[in-house]
Swiss-Prot record:
BP GO annotations: intracellular protein transmembrane transport; protein import; protein targeting; protein transport by the Sec complex
Protein name (record): Protein translocase subunit SecA
Gene name in the database record: secA
GO cellular component, one term: cell envelope Sec protein transport complex
Residue numbers binding ATP: 87, 105-109, 499
Residue sites binding Zn(2+) per the record: 895, 897, 906-907
MF terms (GO), sorted A to Z: ATP binding; metal ion binding; protein-exporting ATPase activity
Xref: PROSITE patterns: SECA, SECA_MOTOR_DEAD
Keywords, in A-Z order: ATP-binding, Cell inner membrane, Cell membrane, Cytoplasm, Membrane, Metal-binding, Nucleotide-binding, Protein transport, Translocase, Translocation, Transport, Zinc
Length: 911
């Protein structure tokens, strides 16, 4: 109570902060007469002038007022649009690395030009991040006119660009791209073998459009680059056949987590079924020998019970295509991980694609935290303000609207079941349709949108259905959703980023209707006609009440509901919004309290009758807050676990960069060889032990295997007081001499290139294996809680130990290959590094399978002078193909290179 009184008297902290920016807005306005008097050439010359001022020691804040005034005037001349004062406030907020919450239609795209231009003046690159390729292209084209006017270059990253095109786009002053393209390019860059092959340049400043969608909704879904493993189609099909016969009373399903647990009777039934199918080793399902088949069982249960066709995925052209739970869009090319996608393929009887092993991975949380400065824009961020600050250290600032909002938000209506609810929705839509009022209906799934479509067909209402099946036309359909009598059904927030303008979108109509009309009088007349028609139609729509937004059920997040409401009432237009709910809605069914069900079911609510209740609305809000809190906890957990991997990832990637930048890595190789010798001697001759306790034969064998040399160990033991340190020093000297002899027999330049190639390949190989090990650890570490231990602390401790073991394995691996391989090299000019294969990219929830740390030692200390990396098999590392040719090695024997693979799958491929 007292808080609300104080807020009324003094305003909120947000109001006070926005008011404090008025001084800067006035400074910007003071420069307007000056820039308005400049010619086009003089206005463009402001850019080199500002850059000179920065070179002389001025800061971006120093030149902000004049720079913003310059952009405002250039926008008037190049785009025909002038920034409002509230948009100037938004630009200042973005420049300061904060989130500007701006309502739909307030011109976020134009606001971004202010901060983008100012920060691009430093020449370090500015990334503007969008949610889809269409918006990246659109904004780069439309705003590119302004930037080019001011002498800045603009690039856009979209799929199917080659590496040279990507590099050129990243080197532009301003780069538009989707979050996925940026993340995957970063991962691919860190799998390459030469600095010149990389496309990214150092991180500087990013502005994220629809920041809540990218940094909140997709925060649980890591970007993954993976490569294929062995085919297990038969196992998936066999397990799926058994799962389809399991009765519902033999398992318990948790719809919140999408996990399935077999009952005791269920375990016994599955054991018998698996035994009959020849899938069980022994008689106990949970014996260690059955770990793999239990994993397949879990995924098959999840696929058959929890994942619904046309809700979680669709079958298109014989393939399983994931549906984005937030937008309803098809996620072509994305696959669930850990065998879930294969389990769904087996369920639907389509071709089962091989599983993939993770080669590189990163979450958006850790990707975007690499930027020294990051800002964001959205229409809905206030409800997630604590999370933005906790994880990204970004404040949310609500920017005032240029014109007061006139939209009317009506109270929710509750019905007993879906059919009653949809009947009422269809009736309201028909009334508004007959009145000419445009209607936008938001649904949560393809299934619901098609069900409502059937209702509207019976009512005789013409309408457009916008869902994952037809997302190619998404922007065009949404853009015209404000036309007279238009009825549009959209899954969730499809079409986000495209304004719904009352009367229709002039630019889209020009594009559609005048596509084939060349420049000239006829086209000019057509444009004038369209503008007049849109203006006339807008007046009719305004008279009909503006855009009517209907929600068919509440989303898990209040923010998503607010996004739907926000499509109506843009720039002071009238409008209304209303949500229809029923007991069968997912939110009420899964998360609603039992008392809600009891009171509703026991009420005398007749079929088709609706009720409105503050108690029910409060219960819905409570359920939403509960889900929001759960999802936030999941995202925080993702950050905690990924931070452990992220620390290790940064070390590995820094090591790769140092290796690629170095002209020679001989010192690194020598340090690794010496460390390997120390480890071998340390294992055989533990500190504090007596010579009688040393494992002499093991030491001989290990030296022979890893270093390829024989040592006079028996003679050394005849000496008095021989110490492990002395043995280490002597073995190092022998190994160094052996390596020096090998180096003198080959071309020096080619040898240096080979050393770098082997370092990178071994580093990449072991890093890939390490990722798989960490993933397996993460899946089971939660069980430590039963032993009264904290899972995250256990994970940190074990992950660090695994990382140290990986580094030891890399040192030994590189040493073995260089010391024991018989290598024939051509001169360096003929030496070609291997090309990066085309790996599969995916973006999958690590907890549900849905689409949706202790600091390490400094990098240079890991391997000595420089750091190491990981790589796959040595294909391409040896220009002459197989260095072991002619040695009579069996094709099924382990490859002498030490990769752990069979010879026929490694160097034997070349033979």
């Amino acid at each position: 109570m007292f808080g609300s009184i104080a807020k009324a008297l003094f305003g909120s902290s947000n109001d006070r902060y926005v008011k404090s920016l008025d001084k800067i807005v006035r400074q910007i306005a003071a420069f307007e007469p000056h820039v308005q008097a400049l010619s086009d050439e003089e206005l463009a010359a402001q850019t080199p002038k500002f850059r000179q001022m920065l070179a002389e020691g001025k800061t971006l804040d120093d030149i902000l007022p004049e720079a913003f005034a310059t952009v405002r005037e250039a926008s008037v001349r190049a785009l025909g649009m002038r920034h409002f004062d509230v948009q100037m406030i938004g630009g200042i907020v973005l420049h300061r690395g904060e989130i500007a919450e701006m309502r739909t239609g307030e011109g976020k795209t134009l606001v971004a030009t202010l901060a983008v231009y100012l920060n691009a003046l430093e020449g370090k690159g500015v990334h503007v991040v969008t949610v889809n390729d269409y918006l990246a292209r659109r904004d780069a084209e439309t705003m590119g006119v302004l930037y080019n006017f001011l002498g800045l270059t603009v690039g856009v990253i979209v799929p199917n660009l080659n590496e040279e095109q990507r590099r050129e786009a990243y080197n532009a002053d301003i780069t538009y791209a989707t979050n996925n393209e940026l993340g995957f390019d970063y991962l691919r860059d860190n799998m390459k073998h030469e600095r010149g092959q990389m496309v990214h340049r150092p991180f500087n400043f990013a502005i994220v459009d629809e920041v809540d969608s990218i940094l909140i909704d997709e925060a649980r879904t890591p970007l993954i680059i993976s490569g294929p493993t062995d085919d297990k189609s038969d196992l998936y099909i066999s397990v799926d056949a058994v799962v389809k016969q399991i009765a519902p009373d033999l398992y318990e399903a948790d719809e919140k987590t999408k996990n399935i647990t077999l009952t005791e009777d269920g375990v016994e039934w599955v054991e018998r079924a698996f035994e009959d199918a020849g899938l069980l080793v022994g008689s106990n399902l949970y014996d260690v020998e059955n770990t793999m088949v239990v994993h397949h069982l879990d995924q098959a249960l999840k696929a058959n019970v929890m994942f619904k066709r046309d809700i979680d995925y669709i079958v298109k052209d014989g393939k399983i295509v994931i549906i984005d739970e937030f937008t309803g869009r098809m996620m072509d090319g994305r696959r669930w991980s850990n065998g879930l996608h294969q389990a769904v393929e087996a369920k639907e009887g389509v071709k089962i694609e091989p599983e993939n092993q993770t080669m590189a991975s990163i979450t958006f949380q850790n990707y975007f935290r690499m930027y020294p400065k990051i800002a964001g824009m959205t229409g809905t961020a206030a409800t997630e303000a604590p999370e933005f600050f906790d994880i990204y250290k970004m404040n949310v600032v609500s920017i005032p609207t240029n014109v007061p909002v006139q939209r009317i938000d009506e109270e929710d209506e509750f019905y007993k079941n879906t059919m009653d609810k949809f009947g009422a929705i269809a009736k309201l839509i028909r009334e508004r349709y007959e009145n000419g009022q445009p209607v936008l209906v938001g649904t949560v799934s393809i299934e619901k949108s098609e069900l409502l479509s059937e209702f509207l067909q019976k009512e005789g209402v013409k309408h457009n259905v916008l869902n994952a099946r037809f997302h190619e036309m998404e922007a065009h359909i949404v853009a015209q959703a404000g036309r007279l009598g238009a009825v549009t059904i959209a899954t969730n927030m499809a079409g986000r980023g495209t304004d719904i303008q009352l009367g229709g979108n002039v630019e889209f109509r020009i594009e559609d209707e005048l596509r084939d009309v060349p420049e000239g009088p006829e086209r000019e007349a057509g444009i004038a006609r369209i503008r007049a028609e849109v203006a006339e139609e807008k007046q009719k729509v305004l008279a009909a009440g503006g855009l009517c937004v209907i929600g068919t059920e509440r989303h898990e997040s209040r923010r998503i509901d607010n996004q739907l409401r926000g499509r109506s009432g843009r720039q002071g237009d009238p409008g209304m919004s209303k949500f229809y709910l029923c007991l069968e809605d997912d939110l009420l069914r899964i998360f609603g309290p039992d008392t809600l069900f009891a009171r509703m079911m026991n009420s005398n609510l007749a079929d088709g009758e609706a009720i409105g209740s503050k108690w029910l609305s409060k219960a819905i809000e409570t359920a939403q807050k509960k889900v929001e809190a759960r999802n936030y906890d999941i995202r925080k957990q993702v950050v905690e676990y990924d931070d452990v991997m992220n620390d290790q990832r940064k070390v590995i990637y820094e090591q790769r960069a140092d290796i690629m930048d170095a002209e020679a890595v001989g010192d690194v190789v020598t340090d690794m060889r010496h460390d390997t010798v120390n480890a071998i001697v340390g294992d055989a001759c533990p500190p504090g032990s007596y010579p009688e306790q040393w494992d002499v034969e093991s030491l001989k064998a290990r030296v022979r295997d890893v270093l390829g040399i024989e040592i006079p160990l028996d003679d050394w033991f005849q000496e008095e007081a021989i110490e492990p340190d002395t043995i280490e020093e002597r073995i190092q000297q022998l190994a160094d001499a052996h390596m020096d002899t090998k180096i003198t027999e080959v071309d020096a330049s080619a040898w240096r290139s080979l050393e770098k190639s082997i370092l990178l390949e071994r580093l990449d190989h072991h890093w890939k294996e390490h990722l798989a090990t960490l993933d397996a650890l993460r899946q089971v570490v939660f069980l430590r809680a039963y032993a009264q231990k904290t899972p995250i602390n256990e994970y940190k401790q074990e992950a660090f130990g695994l990382f140290e073991k990986m580094l030891d394995a890399i040192r030994e691996d590189v040493t073995r290959i260089l010391m024991t391989s018989e290598i024939r090299l051509r001169p360096v000019e003929e030496f070609q590094l291997p090309e990066l294969p085309d790996f599969l990219t995916s973006h999958i929830d690590p907890f549900t399978g849905e689409n949706d740390a202790a600091p390490l030692a400094p990098a240079p200390s890991m391997f000595g002078a420089l750091p190491p990396q990981a790589g796959g098999a040595l294909s391409g590392g040896f220009p002459d193909g197989d260095p072991f040719a002619g040695q009579g090695i069996s094709r099924n024997a382990p490859c002498p290179c030490g990769s752990g693979q069979k010879y026929k799958h490694c160097h034997g491929v070349a033979a």
